[in-house]
Design a protein with these regions (language model features):
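Short, charge/polar-rich alpha-helical segments
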Residues: 1-23
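Short, charge-rich amphipathic interface segments used for partner binding and complex assembly
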Residues: 23, 27-70
């Protein structure tokens, strides 16, 4: 963890983190929808996880493209 990282590498890592967070958010949202009728508790947990990844996406979007997603 003591590696020196240049700005381009940091930007690449943040883009990879955003792509991963987007994939996870979609996965948990889909799981929430699948479990809605059969497992309400599991559906709730999946919804919470989906919201957590959505928050990560918002933060990374603001870091990577400041002011673009103002809502």
């Amino acid at each position: 963890m003591t590696d020196v990282v240049d700005a381009d590498e940091l930007l690449r890592r943040m883009h990879r983190a955003r792509a991963c967070a987007l994939e996870q958010e979609r996965t948990w949202r889909g799981r929430r929808d699948e479990l809605r009728t059969t497992d309400p508790e599991g559906s709730h947990e999946a919804a919470v996880r989906s919201l957590a990844y959505e928050a990560v996406l918002r933060v990374l979007d603001e870091v990577l493209t400041p002011g673009r997603n103002t809502a």
